[in-house]
Amino acid sequence: MTTASPSQVRQNYHQDSEAAINRQINLELYASYVYLSMSYYFDRDDVALKNFAKYFLHQSHEEREHAERLMKLQNQRGARIFLQDIKKPDRDDWENGLNAMECALCLERSVNQSLLELHKLATEKNDPHLCDFIETHYLNEQVEAIKELGDHITNLRKMGALWIGHGRVPL
């Protein structure tokens, strides 16, 4: 194994920021993995909720793209990428659309909190480029994703109450 040579392009990029970005890459890949699990759960023949499957597959691809964008940033800033093991999703059975959406909301809030902490670190390390990068590519998108999931959860709860009110249980 050869030792990596020092970067020619690294400037004003603190080691703590580099490490935090590597952790964020792992979290984004984990989120992608969870959404992939959800997608293929809803694609099963005994579940057969194709729109949920498509929605979560799209979310999986988005999260993977977020990780790739962070990896590109690491290279642009002269940092090194250190990939870690990706944790298995906490469950394999997502039960129903409402439960999966609630889990997705918790996941997105966790990702958002991690990004806010990363932004705080970048501010403390006086790294305006990293602050701008996080603000431009992540923070608003996270707020929009959290709002979208909240809306889906509200609508699914209303639909469930409507079905139960008519003496029927939704499939």
Swiss-Prot record:
<keyword id="KW-0560">Oxidoreductase</keyword>
<dbReference type="InterPro" id="IPR012347">
    <property type="entry name" value="Ferritin-like"/>
</dbReference>
<comment type="similarity">
    <text>Belongs to the ferritin family.</text>
</comment>
<keyword id="KW-0408">Iron</keyword>
<dbReference type="GO" id="GO:0004322">
    <property type="term" value="F:ferroxidase activity"/>
</dbReference>
<feature type="modified residue" description="N-acetylthreonine; in Ferritin heavy chain, N-terminally processed">
    <location>
        <position position="2"/>
    </location>
</feature>
<feature type="binding site">
    <location>
        <position position="142"/>
    </location>
    <ligand>
        <name>Fe cation 2</name>
    </ligand>
</feature>
<dbReference type="Pfam" id="PF00210">
    <property type="entry name" value="Ferritin"/>
</dbReference>
<feature type="binding site">
    <location>
        <position position="63"/>
    </location>
    <ligand>
        <name>Fe cation 1</name>
    </ligand>
</feature>
<keyword id="KW-0007">Acetylation</keyword>
<feature type="binding site">
    <location>
        <position position="66"/>
    </location>
    <ligand>
        <name>Fe cation 1</name>
    </ligand>
</feature>
<dbReference type="GO" id="GO:0006826">
    <property type="term" value="P:iron ion transport"/>
</dbReference>
<keyword id="KW-0968">Cytoplasmic vesicle</keyword>
<feature type="binding site">
    <location>
        <position position="63"/>
    </location>
    <ligand>
        <name>Fe cation 2</name>
    </ligand>
</feature>
<dbReference type="InterPro" id="IPR009040">
    <property type="entry name" value="Ferritin-like_diiron"/>
</dbReference>
<dbReference type="InterPro" id="IPR008331">
    <property type="entry name" value="Ferritin_DPS_dom"/>
</dbReference>
<keyword id="KW-0479">Metal-binding</keyword>
<feature type="domain" description="Ferritin-like diiron">
    <location>
        <begin position="11"/>
        <end position="160"/>
    </location>
</feature>
<dbReference type="GO" id="GO:0006955">
    <property type="term" value="P:immune response"/>
</dbReference>
<dbReference type="GO" id="GO:0110076">
    <property type="term" value="P:negative regulation of ferroptosis"/>
</dbReference>
<comment type="subunit">
    <text>Oligomer of 24 subunits. There are two types of subunits: L (light) chain and H (heavy) chain. The major chain can be light or heavy, depending on the species and tissue type. The functional molecule forms a roughly spherical shell with a diameter of 12 nm and contains a central cavity into which the insoluble mineral iron core is deposited. Interacts with NCOA4; NCOA4 promotes targeting of the iron-binding ferritin complex to autolysosomes following starvation or iron depletion.</text>
</comment>
<dbReference type="GO" id="GO:0005776">
    <property type="term" value="C:autophagosome"/>
</dbReference>
<dbReference type="GO" id="GO:0008285">
    <property type="term" value="P:negative regulation of cell population proliferation"/>
</dbReference>
<dbReference type="GO" id="GO:0008198">
    <property type="term" value="F:ferrous iron binding"/>
</dbReference>
<protein>
    <recommendedName>
        <fullName>Ferritin heavy chain</fullName>
        <ecNumber>1.16.3.1</ecNumber>
    </recommendedName>
</protein>
<feature type="modified residue" description="N-acetylmethionine">
    <location>
        <position position="1"/>
    </location>
</feature>
<keyword id="KW-0458">Lysosome</keyword>
<dbReference type="GO" id="GO:0008199">
    <property type="term" value="F:ferric iron binding"/>
</dbReference>
<feature type="binding site">
    <location>
        <position position="28"/>
    </location>
    <ligand>
        <name>Fe cation 1</name>
    </ligand>
</feature>
<keyword id="KW-0963">Cytoplasm</keyword>
<feature type="binding site">
    <location>
        <position position="108"/>
    </location>
    <ligand>
        <name>Fe cation 2</name>
    </ligand>
</feature>
<keyword id="KW-0409">Iron storage</keyword>
<dbReference type="GO" id="GO:0005764">
    <property type="term" value="C:lysosome"/>
</dbReference>
<dbReference type="InterPro" id="IPR009078">
    <property type="entry name" value="Ferritin-like_SF"/>
</dbReference>
<dbReference type="InterPro" id="IPR001519">
    <property type="entry name" value="Ferritin"/>
</dbReference>
<dbReference type="GO" id="GO:0031410">
    <property type="term" value="C:cytoplasmic vesicle"/>
</dbReference>
<dbReference type="InterPro" id="IPR014034">
    <property type="entry name" value="Ferritin_CS"/>
</dbReference>
<dbReference type="GO" id="GO:0006879">
    <property type="term" value="P:intracellular iron ion homeostasis"/>
</dbReference>
<comment type="function">
    <text>Stores iron in a soluble, non-toxic, readily available form. Important for iron homeostasis. Has ferroxidase activity. Iron is taken up in the ferrous form and deposited as ferric hydroxides after oxidation. Also plays a role in delivery of iron to cells. Mediates iron uptake in capsule cells of the developing kidney. Delivery to lysosomes is mediated by the cargo receptor NCOA4 for autophagic degradation and release of iron.</text>
</comment>
